[in-house]
């Protein structure tokens, strides 16, 4: 019972749904996500931990960086994520996707530093 409650709790927050929708496009590191959402890193990390605890996302470490992806190994969780995706319109995600795209372009052009985003200014990003 607690497992299903954790899943629904994780899916009941707009920010977490936005994170899942972004991860639907592929693996992202924390700096990618907080730049896309225009939020501070600790807040995004909290939401990522809730999603991970619910078994909705998985992570992998690459050096000192952590990359997140949707964990689709469980059929029920995958179904719930896809159901949530259907309820989120592209218009709802337009600004997040634009910020993510701009951040990824900037990060690529600045050899991973992403210095355009004030939150991570003067600190290295995930090195992609």
Regions found by a protein language model. Give the residues of each.
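N-terminal helix-turn-helix DNA-binding core of bacterial DNA-binding proteins
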Residues: 2-43, 49, 65-75
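Generic cytosolic/nucleocytoplasmic N-terminal low-complexity/intrinsically disordered segments
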Residues: 42, 60, 120-123
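N-terminal leader segment of winged-helix/HTH proteins
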Residues: 1-11, 56, 82, 112
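A general structural signal for well-ordered secondary-structure junctions
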Residues: 14, 29, 57, 109-110
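C-terminal regulatory/oligomerization modules of transcriptional regulators
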Residues: 25, 53, 74-128
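Beta-hairpin "wing" of winged helix-turn-helix
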Residues: 53-62, 69
């Amino acid at each position: 019972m607690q497992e299903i409650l954790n899943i629904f709790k994780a899916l009941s927050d707009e920010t977490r749904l936005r994170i899942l929708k972004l991860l639907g496009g592929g693996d992202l590191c924390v700096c990618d996500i907080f730049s896309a959402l225009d939020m501070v890193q600790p807040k995004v990390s909290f939401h990522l931990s809730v999603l991970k605890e619910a078994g909705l996302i998985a992570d992998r470490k690459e050096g000192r960086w952590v990359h997140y992806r949707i964990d689709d190994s469980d059929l029920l969780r995958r179904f719930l994520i896809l159901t949530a995706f259907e309820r989120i319109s592209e218009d709802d995600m337009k600004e997040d996707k634009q910020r993510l795209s701009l951040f990824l372009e900037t990060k690529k052009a600045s050899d991973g530093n992403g210095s355009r985003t004030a939150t991570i200014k003067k600190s290295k990003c995930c090195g992609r």
